[in-house]
Amino acid sequence: MSQEQPHSPIQDARVNAVIERMQAARRRPPGGGPRGGFSSRDPHAYAEQGFSIHPEQGELIYMLCRSLRATRVAEFATSVGMSTLYFAAAMRDNGGGTVIGSEIVPAKVETARRNLDDAGLAAYAEIREGDARKTLRDLGGPVDFILIDGWPGGEGPSLARQVIEIVAPQLRVGGYVMNDNAEPDFLDFVRDPKSGFVSMTLPLKGGTELSLKVA
């Protein structure tokens, strides 16, 4: 029996063509990303590396955003815009909305905007250049979904932990947070019942945390 090709919930050929192009161009430095460690803690040192979520994660983001009828979502970090495409496609297909992304490397901001334009989704995305601890401090109202998939940061609390503490109060009850890198202090936050979340680990990309805000 032949194995069927994975079916994407996104049926826009223009969007899928950009996603496929980005997948083909994906390159990662030795160490394999945040779980494998970096030779530099400076995100600018990897300005040409497009760290991205995997398609299965992106498709789950799209489906959850559709089910929520999401209209305002956010992400840290945008990188070259892979996750942004899935969010923006969901915003468009929901009838309108905005994904607010944060990216500190200027070259990646330009690449992400170009990829969104190529996919016909630029009108549904706002990429803020700079440190997410500043750029995501005001998301303009309650958000439905947040992706935290950014640089690990230096000594002390991870950037993921710092960012979740900033954006969690802006996430509506019933909204989701997805985390790709499993930073221990981030997991401590979302798994603490006092934080107002229930959380689970999904078998995607070696372990993806999905957290639902319940209070």
Model region roles, listed by residue range:
Residues D149:
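Active-site residues of response regulator receiver
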